[in-house]
């Protein structure tokens, strides 16, 4: 699963979940 990337560099939550931070996907 791809995770969301915060500006702090830490991953938070699952990318694509309810379109949450879909522009910050970590591959």
UniProtKB/Swiss-Prot annotation:
InterPro entries: Scorpion_toxin-like_sf
GO biological process, one term: defense response to fungus
Taxonomic superkingdom: Eukaryota
Residues recorded as bearing Pyrrolidone carboxylic acid in the entry: 1
Functional summary from the UniProt entry: Possesses some antifungal activity sensitive to inorganic cations and antibacterial activity against B.megaterium.
Family: Belongs to the DEFL family.
Assembly and oligomerization: Forms oligomers in its native state.
Name of the protein this chain belongs to: Defensin-like protein 2
Upper classification of the organism: Eukaryota, Viridiplantae, Streptophyta, Embryophyta, Tracheophyta
């Amino acid at each position: 699963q791809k995770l969301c990337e915060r500006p702090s560099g830490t991953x938070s939550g699952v990318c694509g979940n309810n379109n949450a931070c879909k522009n910050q996907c970590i591959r």
